[in-house]
Amino acid sequence: MVSERQTWSLLQGGQCNEYTVAYINARIIDPASGTDYKGYLLTRGKEILDFGPGFFDPNGAAFAASEVVDCNGHVLMPGIVDLHVHLREPGGEHKETVDTGSRAAAAGGVTTVVCQPNTIPRLENVLVAKYLKMRALESSCVNIEFYGAVTKSDGELCDMASLKDAGALGFTDDGLPVMNALYMKRAFEYAQDLDVVVAQHAEDCNLSDGGCINEGLVSRELGLKGIPDISESIMVSRDIQLLREVPGAHYHVLHISTKKALDIVRAAKREGLRVTCEVTPHHFLLNESAVLEHGTMAKMNPPLRTEEDRLSMISGLEDGTIDCIATDHAPHAAQEKTRPISCCAFGIVGLETLLPLSLELYHNAGMSLMDVLSKLTSKPAEIVRLPRGKIAKGLVADLVIFDLEHVWTIDTAKFSSKSKNSPFQGRKVKGKVLRTVVSGKTVYRAE
């Protein structure tokens, strides 16, 4: 556990009375700079004041801390940036709220969440954006960012410029794809001028309509309509052809799940197009057979695919084709997941399990720890051009301390999230968040 003691001194040599914290005996890992050493980190107010290798005396002549946190050799890294979160406000407060979702994020070491716009009403105008920002200020203990919608509820394109001015980091219709090719091309054109990303839920609904799990052996065994892998790859292929017409635009594939789509992204990157993509832990840890064991808790969109697809996701992470890991945190009320699988809700929660599940790539799949952590911190921040996900003097102190070797069992009953829908209930994992810091303030501490 993280230990601490209190002194009540000020920075010597000045009149600053901001709260100061010294994190000592830490294994500092910063993927953005390649840093990995035992050392210390100092914060003052909301910012990182200094950090470095070796021993640090928090009561020395140069610095006396308001608080000293002994990390006991555990990893201290930048806070996790999750690009794909559904906090459900406004309109879905029975599933999740900004308050409960942000506490779930803090418990998972996630210091920045990027909300998807498929709320009720949709995040398609400045009024809804202002509402979300107000709720974040009132209730959130982590940084809340958001995507704006590409299209309005009436099917017309959103005013992307005004939404960007209101704080949108990019644009997507996640939950559904932008099916209209002309609208997608226009979105690329506007986004190129605004220098923001367009993110796509890659699915051709004409092929997937009515499907509930992957089209394959399991869907046939259960007699369920399946969602074919080409519904994803055809949409990715179409979008990349459109991107060639607007080569300065940035295209991001959300929750990629198939080898076919990944191969298309890999080729586009080699071509020099601005294409990035993300993958969820469930798509690199589980395959379609999980539906037989976990039932509705293993129903999500895109669905769990074949074992070949799952292994290709790991290969994509290893070779850099997949840029980052995101949760697609999709909370649902219990009654929405206890209906028959053919008609229950898609989606699972993921904020509180993101780090340990991602660490399975390090513990079990042979990826370097630096590579795994980069896909949770600096890489997602770069995609949406946020000055977060790294450790540097003067940056906001968003930090996570975690025990790399701690073994524990996932218990959804203990989640801070309002919803408990996860196929990882009862799974033994290794790696536990001990403390989460947002803007210099501790917002979560393990019991």
Curated annotation (Swiss-Prot):
Keywords per UniProt: Hydrolase, Metal-binding, Pyrimidine biosynthesis, Zinc
Cofactor binding description: Binds 2 Zn(2+) ions per subunit.
Any single biological process term in GO: purine nucleobase catabolic process
Disulphide bonds in the chain: none
Pathway annotation: Pyrimidine metabolism; UMP biosynthesis via de novo pathway; (S)-dihydroorotate from bicarbonate: step 3/3
Residues annotated as binding substrate: 86-88, 118, 301, 332, 346-347
UniProt cross-references to InterPro entries, sorted A to Z: Amidohydro-rel, DHOase, DHOase/Allantoinase_Hydrolase, Dihydroorotase_CS, Metal-dep_hydrolase_composite, Metal_Hydrolase
Sequence positions that bind Zn(2+) 2: 174, 201, 255
Active-site residues (renumbered): 328
Sequence similarity: Belongs to the metallo-dependent hydrolases superfamily. DHOase family. Class I DHOase subfamily.
Protein's name in the database: Dihydroorotase
Organism expressing this protein natively: Anaplasma phagocytophilum (strain HZ)
